[in-house]
Amino acid sequence: NYLYSERHHIELKERLKCVLHRTLRKDVSEYIKYTNREAMTVAFNPTPAEEELYREVSAYIQDVSKIAVTTRYRTLIVLMIRKLMSSSTAAVKGTLEKLMERLCRIEKLGGNTGDLIVFDEDLLEEYQDSLSDFDDRCRNAYAKNYPTDADLKAEKEFLQSLIDKAGKIEVDGKTEKLVGAINRGFEKIREKGGLRKVIIFTESNRTLNYLFDYLSAHGFKDKIITFNGQNNSPLCNRIYNDFVENHSAELTGSRANDMKKALVAAFREEAEIMIATEAAAEGLNLQFCSLLVNYDLPWNPQRIEQRIGRIHRYKQKCDVVIINFINKQNLADVRLYDILQY
């Protein structure tokens, strides 16, 4: 294979070096003075109720006899659900409700599951490209094994029990540590001369909304804006309309670009907190902010670096502080944390 041959790698580098030059940050440090970066870790343990829910949902999605999780592309769907489980109970509950909707549709259509796969706007944005590659094929997939009425009834009852358990968990274990972590971060950046601003990254839109409500009720009401792939909330639309009215000379004619400008301006001039999904990990210049919270850790370390690059960049005047939430009982989180130490 050309891509994995060492000889071809060397040949390709020789062919490209006359037109392609890679400059690392360390290569220009003599000319451009980048600020320092300080990392903080917030370790947390899920509550017993969260642990029980995680075990039961894990067993459910791994059971190949279950109807709601499609047989085709099961591995990818299970992967995404696992990531949502590590994000928040709110994300888990919403996903379980989507699975229940799927069972009800299967029941209504008499067992034909051909065009029914769990497509949900809350699927992790980092997997959207992978999903689009087989979207059409999934929608045209045909399941030959029709579930019985008894199977559907039993699975719906079990799924409802999981939804009920999720609904009883009002605040997650790691959420209880969020306000304290933000305030410690604010104190750190105050000492470094930074502004009282923080961007919080999550991988789930439902977690974004859950955190917005939680922080609004715990001292940050009217101090928060959100940024995701849609930016169609009433708050985003209000900010956009205000920006259009007061900054007409800066408009580009593209609603998506102007919305991005409006949200960045609102964060810079008014808000203390921006809660964002991976949609904000590229293309935003937030050098006026020097505090970042990784509420969810992507499994790809490069994505973490892309997030940090929103604030730790050229024209950043202060040292930056990065707060990483680590689930000490999640082996993937622990391993990723170990990787980030090097």
Model regions: which residues?
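Secondary-structure transition/capping motifs at alpha-helix termini
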Residues: 218-222, 299, 314-318
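Conserved Helicase C-terminal RecA-like lobe
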Residues: 34-46, 93-270
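SF2 helicase motor core recognition
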Residues: 264, 275-289, 309-313
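Inter-lobe coupling linker of SF2 helicases/translocases
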Residues: 1-115, 332-342
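A short beta-strand element within the Helicase C-terminal
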Residues: 285-296, 321-324
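A conserved SF2-helicase RecA2
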Residues: 302-308, 313-342
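Conserved nucleotide-binding/hydrolysis micro-motifs of P-loop NTPases
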Residues: 47-51, 84-85, 91-92, 99, ...
